[in-house]
Curated annotation (Swiss-Prot):
Keywords: Acetylation, Cytoplasmic vesicle, Membrane, Phosphoprotein, Synapse, Transmembrane, Transmembrane helix. May be tyrosine phosphorylated by Src. The modification N-acetylmethionine is found at M1. Pfam families: MARVEL (PF01284). Belongs to the synaptogyrin family. PROSITE patterns: MARVEL. GO terms for biological process: protein targeting; regulated exocytosis; synaptic vesicle membrane organization. The modification Phosphoserine is found at S3. This is Synaptogyrin-2. The chain crosses the membrane at residues 30-50, 73-93, 105-125, 147-167. Its main location: membrane.
Length: 224
């Protein structure tokens, strides 16, 4: 794992193609792109067939249009998402804001985990519909249907690896933040700084005051 925030080098460095293509998430994304491309290409290419008695096209998976739509949809979205995150990986080290890096890594983690689940559902769905398909309904496109099922199965693991790598990057960023965080709470064992003692000055009588005469020695005026 590279040093820096969230598994990437510190911002400001130049783009290094060799280091970029050697990153585990980049290699896994390229594999995921190829797998997704094969899946939706097989469905778009030979996933819809027609019988001799009709010109209407049907999905090769037990004539279930939802199966073809689901497989092609997750394949196309997986391909586009992989391309997007490849661009993010290329410019990730140029992002200086740690908060932006965190949100990108979290987005990668959530999307990869979701697509791992969707590929699992797609594999089970396509396998179930293919098992229920009548042999007479599949004159062509059988190999493409099997290929779509096979590479859907492989996509489960590739996206699972991407989710695991994203989690490791997120955890590395959180750990780095905790290590560099300084608690502003003062140490209770540290004595408080004593305030400077107030200097006692000699009291001075304020001006413009009259001394109060005491009644001691008072004599009344003479009476005539």
């Amino acid at each position: 794992m590279e040093s820096g925030a969230y598994g990437a080098a510190n911002a400001g460095g130049s783009f290094d193609l060799r280091r970029y293509v050697s990153q585990p998430q980049v290699v896994t994304r390229l594999v995921s792109m190829v797998l997704a491309l094969i899946v939706f290409s097989c469905i778009f290419g030979e996933g819809y067939i027609n019988l001799h008695s009709s010109d209407q096209l049907h999905c090769v998976f037990n004539r279930n249009e939802d199966a073809c739509r689901y497989g092609s949809a997750i394949g196309v979205l997986a391909f586009l998402a992989s391309a997007f995150f490849l661009v993010v990986d290329a410019f990730f080290s140029q992002i200086s804001n740690a908060t932006d890096r965190k949100y990108l890594v979290i987005g990668d983690l959530l999307f990869s985990a979701l697509w791992t689940f969707l590929w699992f559902v797609g594999f089970c769905f396509l396998t179930n519909q293919w098992a229920a398909t009548k042999p007479d309904d599949v004159l062509v496109g059988a190999d493409s249907a099997r290929a779509a099922i096979t590479f859907s199965f492989f996509s489960i693991f590739s996206w699972g690896v991407l989710a695991s790598l994203a989690y490791q990057r997120y955890k590395a960023g959180v750990d780095a933040f905790i290590q560099n965080y300084v608690d502003p709470t003062p140490d209770p064992t540290t004595a408080y700084a004593s305030y400077p003692s107030a200097s006692v000055e000699n009291y001075q009588q304020p001006p413009f005051t009259q001394n109060v005469e005491t009644t001691e020695g008072y004599q009344p005026p003479p009476v005539y």
